[in-house]
Amino acid sequence: MWNPKKKSEALAKFKSFPYPKPGTSNVLDSKEGDTRRKYFTKTHLHRLFVFVVLLLCSGYFLKHTLLTRPKESNVVMIFVNNIGGGVLDVKSPRQWELEKISTENKKKYAERHGYHFFVKSTGLKRRYAHEWRESWEKADYIMEAMKKYPHAEWFWWVDLTTFIMEPQYSLEKLIINRLDHIATRNITDSMEFNPKNFHEIPFVDYSEDINFILGQDCNGFSLGSFLVRRSDWTSRLMDFLWDPVVYGQKHMDWPHDEQNAIEYFYENNAWLRSGMGFVPLRLFNSYPPGACAGEGENPRFFYNQKEGDFLVNLAGCNYGRDCLDEINHYKGLAQRKRGWRKLVPFL
């Protein structure tokens, strides 16, 4: 016989199955949820670990394979040492150490950015005792580098007594690609820095390409670090600098050698002014305390660690200062500043 009460009880059981009654917990579901959460947590940690490992391996691979593949560089670094000493004095152990530190610094920078590294030694050549012709030979070395690397466009001369403080900066990003924004063409303008008091001359065309990039210090043109571009203009300048007649007549009158020569040509030749561009000295030729005597702490000239100056030039360290002590000081500053990068191998 049909019983409505039993039917209601059966229907109630059917509706509640397999869900728990209100106010009760499902122990089985709780255990399964905990297991799933633990599984997903372990899986996520494992995936994160694999991702970090792959990232580090990729960085290492890029640094040591793709980024170091040989390529035809557009830049040549010209660096001159003096293996045999010279006519002025005998080379001491401290001078050897200075040369070793400076050479290693430049070589690492060239390797980092894929630049050609053109090293020349002045050697023990016969010279007159009253001459210091190594400076005049800059023109020869630049022309020799141009012949050796016929496809390169820019040639960076950098003195022995310099130290690159921020090697992560390429010359392209630092200077070459920004010339339109950072270079001054006419330093005779009243608003520009003009320590030699040059005057305007006619027929100068500042719309021509820049072929010579340099800075000025308290005494005039600074040639411890400068850039020249391969061009007919540069070939003409090199010929002027090494002309035997000019050298024979003027080398005793110009105590600063090629610096005085270029200043003389700049003062009197419109074609030379048309191809030159001046950048702030500290852009790639900062001075240490002691250089530019009488200037105190003029921010125009002197190295500023906080602002990350690219290179320090120990100008004049051979006169009353210690070149080795100074280059070791700046080497230590650079190492401390970049120490954290050693934690990540591909930086």
From Swiss-Prot:
It is found in: Endoplasmic reticulum membrane. Residues 1-44 are cytoplasmic. One of its GO terms (biological process) is protein N-linked glycosylation. It comes from the Eukaryota. It holds the Pfam family Glyco_transf_34. Signal peptide: none annotated. It is an enzyme of class 2 (transferase). This is Uncharacterized alpha-1,2-galactosyltransferase C637.06. It comes from Schizosaccharomyces pombe (strain 972 / ATCC 24843).
